[in-house]
């Protein structure tokens, strides 16, 4: 059985860890992949992604459902937009969303700022 104990007489000891080594192919292909992603990012943008739909959560699929489209104005984080909504207890999704807002918009008591995650 090999002896891995430290002995200063045998000179410096090195420990190699796999996490510091990368596949040569991935190192070479990474810039190419990045360039490809940047070039095709514009093509993959769907105009439908610029709109949000307010759906009534109490109506299941297949029932008559009134859809309201909202134009996206500003993104807060990658998957999030801030909305001002009328607030009335648990039924806030039934209310009409008043408008998209900027940070400078004054928030009134009966309105609540929400982050809506688009999943």
UniProtKB/Swiss-Prot annotation:
UniProt keyword terms in alphabetical order: Viral occlusion body
Annotated Pfam families: Polyhedrin
Domain of life where this protein originates: Viruses
Record keyword S-adenosyl-L-methionine present: no
Annotated GO CC locations: viral occlusion body
InterPro entries: Polyhedrin
GO terms for MF: structural molecule activity
Family statement drawn from the similarity comment of this UniProt entry: Belongs to the polyhedrin family.
Functional description taken from the UniProt entry: Major component of the virus occlusion bodies, which are large proteinaceous structures (polyhedra), that protect the virus from the outside environment for extended periods until they are ingested by insect larvae.
Protein name: Polyhedrin
Organism whose genome encodes this protein: Antheraea pernyi nuclear polyhedrosis virus (ApNPV)
Gene name linked to the record: PH
